[in-house]
Amino acid sequence: MKKRLCAVLLASPLLFSAAVFADDAQQLRDKLIGTASLKADFKQTVTDVNKKVIQTGSGIFALAYPNQFYWHLTQPDESQIVADGKDLWIYNPFAEEVVIMDFAEAINASPIALLVHRDDATWSQYAVTKQQDCYEIKPKAIDSGILSVKVCFKNAQLANFNVADDKGNLSQFDLSNQQAITDKDKALFSFVLPDNVDVDDQRRKTAH
């Protein structure tokens, strides 16, 4: 699940011209600019290729521009993903393990990167197609297990999104209690390393 998010629905691209894709992408960018920060509760449902529910969960989700991300799964098994703009931390309390990754390498492989990026270079890597109140984001080159992300809005507010992977699984995330990040909430994006945990610092392995 963590890999599906970091690296977490189709309309045929033959039906759309490049100009339409560009317009759809700009519309999505404009909507996300209006969502410079967001905190919400989420409910998660994962279905397999046969549309059978294989996992459910709930927790807290937050994002802030630029490049800050918080994901706290509280049920059924606790886990955290925190991006502070430079590094991405994945914490598994049950395994007592923390994995640290370079943020850009971890998140850029996924269409979900567009939720926290505004730069042209990142957006040029994805095709965006509008579908009523939703936008499907697909990488132009498949470099990860994520095939697409669909984000949906209600009254200009991010309401839900889903992630489709190459195994045929679909992870649906429905948001509630949406609100802007407060000064107090900014602490969510600063990961505090717990005591007595194993640390797998993968930044060293990818350092130049």
UniProtKB/Swiss-Prot annotation:
Pfam families: LolA. One of its GO terms (cellular component) is outer membrane-bounded periplasmic space. GO terms for biological process: lipoprotein localization to outer membrane; lipoprotein transport. SUPFAM superfamilies: Prokaryotic lipoproteins and lipoprotein localization factors. The keyword Chaperone applies. Residues 1-22 form the signal peptide. It is found in: Periplasm. Keywords: Chaperone, Periplasm, Protein transport, Signal, Transport. Belongs to the LolA family. Participates in the translocation of lipoproteins from the inner membrane to the outer membrane. Only forms a complex with a lipoprotein if the residue after the N-terminal Cys is not an aspartate (The Asp acts as a targeting signal to indicate that the lipoprotein should stay in the inner membrane). PANTHER family: OUTER-MEMBRANE LIPOPROTEIN CARRIER PROTEIN. Monomer. NCBIfam families: lolA (TIGR00547). This is Outer-membrane lipoprotein carrier protein. It comes from Shewanella baltica (strain OS195). The gene is lolA.
